[in-house]
Amino acid sequence: MSYNPYRSRNYGGGYSNNGYRQRHYYSDYNESSYNSSYRDQYDRNGSYSGSKGRHYNSGTSRNAPPPSSSAYSSDSSSRTYANSSSSGPAKIPVGPKSLTIDGSTNGDLPTAGTQKHNIPPTNAISGTDATTGVNPNDSNFTQLLLHQDLSKQIEFSGEIDSKRNYKVIYDPELDKSLSKAERKTKQKKIRFNGESLSSHDVTDPRKSSTGSTSAYFLKPNKKSKKFPFKQLPQPKFIYDKDSLGPPPQNEIVVWDLPSTTSEVYLSNFFKSYGDSIKDLKFINDPLNAVPLGIATCKFQGNPDKSMRIAKKFIANVRINHTKIDGAELKIALNDNDNKLLDDKIKVAQDKLRISRIKIEEEEKKRLKKQQAIEDQKRRETEKAAKEKKLQESANSSHESRFKPNTTTLSIRHHNEVIPGVFLPRELRKYIRDRPYIFINDKYVPTRKVSSQDIKKVLNKYDWTRVLPDRSGFFVVFNSIKECERCFINEDGRKFFEYKMFMELALPENFNESSSSTSNNDNTDLSASNRKQNDVVEEASNMLIKEFQNFLAKDIRERVIAPVVLDLLSHDKYPKLVEELKAKELATKKAASPIVTNAVRQVKSKPNVLSSLAIKSKPQAILPSFRKKKDLPNAGLNSANKAKKNVIPMQHALNYDHESDESDEDDSTRSTTPLTPTLKRERSPTVSSVSNDNDIEDKLEDIQKPSKKKQKKTKLHQSFLYDSASDEDMEAVSEEKEVEKDESEGEEDIDYSHIDKIYQPTEDYPRPVYEEVPRFPSDPLDLDALQSIIKDDEDITLLQTALADVTSESNIKNMEYWAWKQKDIKAKAGVQEISEDLEVIGPLDSRFDSKSGAFKSEGYRKIPDADKIEYLPHRRKIHKPIKTIQHDDDELNANNSTTNNNSNNIQSSRVNRANNRRFAADISAQKQMLGSETDILNLNALTKRKKPVSFARSAIHNWGLYALEPIAAKEMIIEYVGESIRQQVAEHRERSYLKTGIGSSYLFRIDENTVVDATKKGGIARFINHCCNPSCTAKIIKVEGKKRIVIYALRDIEANEELTYDYKFEKETNDAERIRCLCGAPGCKGYLN
């Protein structure tokens, strides 16, 4: 079968009689229809024409008629589409021939000029009119679908109503999710005539998927296989030298900047966004160079890139509402004509001009107001001058009216002036020739009215005193003017149920001129101001007196005393010094026979037994020439009192001056006299001799006077600051000299035939063998018996004690048994380990060596928890923390009871008062110098700190201890160190952790400041951590600077360790946690 090269499709179907097949498609839209016809031309006899053509014809109306016919022609070079209407036959040129649609053919195509005459008006064969296209014979043929009017509605032959167009919305046969049985139960969903659709729902299908045409320019998504424009690239034009027009604008304009904004600050702000800028300029007023708050800048790079960066920067600033110095940043891109910049400059200049005009107006107002004030003052001055003249004239009249020793009667008596005054004798010492007002008792009775009531009534007047008397009230004034004013205004005034009639009296010795001149300046002052001036004057007088005392003291100590001491120097009076020394030598020689006789009587005893016998007899007390205090063995009745701290006058001022410059810890701390302990006690004979001070002194003077004098000088120089220790060391040296002298004067006795351990001693009786202390838990074995029994006397005593004891064991060979017992003990490895008289128990099993020898296991770090078990200063962790201890606690207790230093300990309030005086002295010295210097800078915290010291701690390494009791809430010490920034502190912390130092000495003050006491700091850095601390840290301001100060949380005893809670942040990693060693009852176990 051959195909026709031309095929036409019509919806509704139908074949034409000339071999065409046509179908027409109609849509069911109301507003528009899509009408297309696809036509392929095939040769009727089965031959293929070699070409295929398609013709698209669309109409906007559903009722538009389809094309009647179409023709297609082709040649080797082109394709031509032709449409023929029903009005006449259409001709298609094919080679030399021509083809007509109605079937007629001609041999040759007619020319344009002959076509009209060659075509007949009516076709002879078909009978069709060539002009109208109407064939009267059409009615004789059968009407096919091809010959129907396709513009009319097609009638359907199915079940559905043919009058309604429809669309299948849902077809169960096409639903793959349903089974065959379910498909039979479902029905089709059909929509008729586009129901439920409105006009606005009809959209262009090309825009329905994305909503814009941008999808046609971008890459298609994975779901779509459509390539509308095959990814056409967007055009980008780069500005270069050949480009036309202005370049892309990349200049930024910033306006309304605060006046405090600097160019460097703004440049750094722009750089913080990561883009480098150039050509940053601040625009100033050209007239007076005042900043207008406008700046311009450009970004670096080519014009296109810099424009993109500028637009991005402006968008970020507007989104984030960026502020500079509290003002929101206003920014925009300048145009090519600088129109934006010129507008902003003009607005800024207008604002500046308006502000300048406003300032000028305010200045004019201020000058006008000032001029008015000056005019007012001038008028007041003139008025005061006039009043002064009038007052002077009035004073002249007063002089004639008010005279001494006169009395002006009350208004009741018409103010009559009479000579003489009434003044009781006992009140004269209070009034002292001053004017006064007398209120008689018959007008205001003193029994019913008190002086306080009179004071309240006359409160507005500057009276001095109100003196009650049985005759009446006397109101005393310092000024005659004030007295007259009170008399004129208050005379005859009603006072309760009485009338207050007054009499103004002037004493006989009253001097009006002195009184008026002394009170002219204070006339305008009120009574409250006068009282305030009195308080200030009194305080000034007190300060002046104190300053005078200090000045006199300084002159006495720094000027007069050195001159007097120089005048009294021994070098200026050599003859007098020699005479005094000769008198002392003569006195010592006169007393020497008595001393030698006494010594010989004492030293005549040959051995220890005789000395023991003498001990039981009462000793004769020899006469004393000079008594010396505070010897160690001065008797039971005498207490160990410290010698008074006496320093020679010629050195007193020097040491007083040096003590001010010494460490303040020593100044605030009470001094305890050093009491040296002798290694062995002296014998009763020697002690009895030493009890008498006179014998000892005379022995030293007679035997070795020069040596004694030399030793005193050396000791005095070395212990000049502690006279008690000076005297004690002097006493020790004197005792040693006495012992040496006695040993030299004693008779020589030969003890060579006696064993050394049995030879007699001269100091005190002692056992032959040293006693070994024993404990109840010690086993009494063979070694213990051998250590107890030393000689034949001990064995004899032991045999006597064990005579009644019978042994039940049968030991044949005693030596073998003894050797066996010792061997068993040695093999068992039982060893007695003692330290500080305390037996240490066996070690824990975790300390056992795994390899059998600790040397083979190498070195390892011992944890702090294990160090507590064997280190002496760590073992005190469970005892009251008192690490600072003296060599002899009992001796210190005795010294504390005998030497009462309570007078030397000052309270905190007194210390602060002394520190304030010292600070005032420093400020006065700085004012005298007249220049600022760091030498006299005073840190008030160093004067308020408590005496503390550092020592080995029971908690960890070193600790800080209190040297005296500290009350709660008192300041202890300042945490001193190097003040650094936060960034530097982080860097140092990392370096400290790498080197193993740790970061426990870094103390934060605020967000930006940290105090580092690792390498530069005070002793406060030794304070240890404790979960139950005794101190706390506070940050205070001293002279405008922040300081870290340690305060006491509770009462702290002397020698108690100071602790503080470090407050580390808790670590989640167990490997980084630090174990706490404080040992407090509420210990948390870890620092962090």
UniProtKB/Swiss-Prot annotation:
Biological role stated in the UniProt entry: Catalytic component of the COMPASS (Set1C) complex that specifically mono-, di- and trimethylates histone H3 to form H3K4me1/2/3. Binds RNAs which might negatively affect its histone methyltransferase activity. COMPASS recognizes ubiquitinated H2B on one face of the nucleosome which stimulates the methylation of H3 on the opposing face.
Domain of life: Eukaryota
Coiled-coil ranges per UniProt: none
Biased composition (Basic residues): 705-715
Motif (RxxxRR motif): 912-917
Positions with a binding annotation for S-adenosyl-L-methionine: 1062
One MF term in the entry's GO annotations: RNA binding
Family: Belongs to the class V-like SAM-binding methyltransferase superfamily.
Biased composition (Low complexity): 1-10, 27-38, 69-87, 510-529
Stretch list, region Disordered: 1-136, 179-217, 365-406, 510-531, 624-747
Pfam families: N-SET, SET, SET1_RBD, SET_assoc
Domain characteristics, as noted in the entry: The RxxxRR motif forms an adapter helix that bridges the nucleosome and ubiquitin.
Name of the protein in its database record: Histone-lysine N-methyltransferase, H3 lysine-4 specific
UniProtKB keywords: Chromatin regulator, Chromosome, Methyltransferase, Nucleus, S-adenosyl-L-methionine, Transferase
An annotated GO BP: methylation
